[in-house]
């Protein structure tokens, strides 16, 4: 079978490399891919942007039997929903589920509603209430741009001055564009960070490692 990998980063390179090793796979297309994926055996780059989801669906319908999505942005845009509506097999969460990655405020509110332990927080869209909250809580404290910011939207502020600067940069300085139009101000937690990643289909849970 043929497989399409959506994305252009190292994550997608690793996915393409691994998928290509499966003897059941004849060809791996990577859209848009990168210089590394272009050199892998059985892999071919395709010049389609990750957010051109209609074009990706057209390509998949004509060329592949399975699509795997790497980046968050097309997931949030609804690439999985579109593919499924057209009867195309695709691995990834729906746009609704992808909000857990696409919006930190959504995720924090979800955790709070479900009584899942999480650091204390508040969401803000205006500078002055956010600054007042900072002064109430003090430092160290964590400032997060709500939306996708290419991994750069989190500031661990060790001083109040640094925290206030981060809030102003995000909410009024447009430091992260629309991603920073809302911020999450979160309690600073000291300790080791660990991730446990699983695959789910709504009923079954499969650990990846």
Where are these regions (language model features)?
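ATP-binding N-terminal substructure of ATP-dependent carboxylate-amine bond-forming enzymes
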Residues: 1-96
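Short beta-strand-to-turn element immediately C-terminal to the catalytic PLP-Schiff-base lysine
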Residues: 7, 124, 155-159, 199-201, ...
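A conserved helix-loop-beta module that forms one wall/lid of the active-site cleft
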Residues: 93-153
């Amino acid at each position: 079978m043929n497989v399409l990998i959506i994305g252009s980063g190292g994550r997608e390179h690793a996915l393409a490399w691994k998928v290509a090793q499966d003897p059941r796979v004849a060809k791996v297309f990577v859209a848009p891919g990168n210089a590394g994926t272009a050199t892998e055996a059985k892999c071919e780059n395709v010049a389609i942007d990750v957010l051109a989801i209609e074009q990706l669906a057209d390509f998949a319908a004509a060329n592949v039997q399975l699509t795997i999505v790497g980046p968050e942005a097309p997931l949030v845009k609804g690439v999985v929903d579109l593919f499924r509506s057209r009867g195309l097999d695709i691995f990834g969460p729906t746009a609704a589920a992808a909000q857990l990655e696409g919006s930190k405020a959504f995720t924090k509110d979800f955790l709070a509603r479900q009584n899942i332990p999480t650091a204390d927080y508040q969401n803000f869209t205006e500078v002055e209430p956010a600054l007042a909250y900072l002064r109430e809580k003090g430092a160290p404290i964590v400032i997060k741009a709500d939306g996708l910011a290419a991994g750069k939207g989190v500031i661990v502020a060790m001083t109040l001055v640094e925290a206030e600067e981060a809030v102003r940069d995000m909410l009024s300085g447009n430091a992260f564009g629309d991603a920073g139009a809302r911020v999450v101000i979160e309690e600073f937690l000291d300790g080791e960070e660990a991730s446990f990643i699983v695959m789910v289909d709504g009923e079954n849970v499969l650990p990846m490692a």
